[in-house]
Design a protein with these regions (language model features):
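Positively charged
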Residues: 1-136
Length: 136
C-alpha cells in the first residue's frame, strides 16, 4: 500500500531498529510508494514511510531491490556528489563510494551479499544513511 512520505527531521534522525520476518510486509509498502513516486524517487528507506525498521528499496534495473537489515561490508573509490531526497527540499553535497559490498536478507529472509557500483551504489548508500538517522 502506498504510504505518505515522512518529512519530520527529528523522526528521520533516529537510528532504525533491526527488521524481523514480521516486517516482510514493508517490502510491498515500500515498492508501492516507490512506484507512486517514480518520477522523482529512485529509493526509499522504511523510516521515510513512518516505520523505524532497517529496510530499504531502490531501483536496480527492471525489479526494485529490497534489503532487510543491510550492512555495508566494504567500500572503495570515494567521490563528491549532490543528492536530493523526497523527505527534504533541494539538493545537498555528500561523499559517496563508487563500489560497495552489502550483506542483507532478501524478501524470503535468505542471507545475501551483493556488490554495487556507480549509481545503484550511490542510491543504496543514501538509503543506508537513512537507517542510521543521517540526513544529507
Amino acid at each position: 500500500m502506498e504510504k505518505k512520505i515522512v518529512k519530520d527531521i527529528l523522526f528521520l534522525s533516529q537510528v532504525s531498529q533491526p527488521a524481523s520476518q514480521d516486517d516482510l510486509y514493508l517490502a510491498r509498502d515500500l515498492q508501492d510508494t516507490l512506484l507512486a513516486n517514480r518520477d522523482t524517487c529512485v529509493g526509499l528507506a522504511a523510516n521515510m514511510i513512518g516505520v523505524q525498521k532497517r529496510v530499504i528499496i531502490f531501483n536496480l534495473g527492471l525489479v526494485p531491490m529490497v534489503m532487510f537489515n543491510p550492512v555495508l561490508l566494504s567500500s572503495e573509490g570515494s567521490y563528491e556528489t549532490e543528492e536530493g531526497c523526497l523527505s527534504l527540499v533541494g539538493v545537498r553535497p555528500t561523499r559517496r563510494y563508487e563500489t560497495i559490498r552489502v550483506a542483507y536478507r532478501d524478501s524470503k529472509w535468505q542471507e545475501q551479499t551483493i556488490t554495487l557500483t556507480g549509481f545503484p551504489a550511490q542510491i543504496c548508500q543514501h538509503e543506508l544513511d537513512h537507517l542510521e538517522g543521517r540526513i544529507i
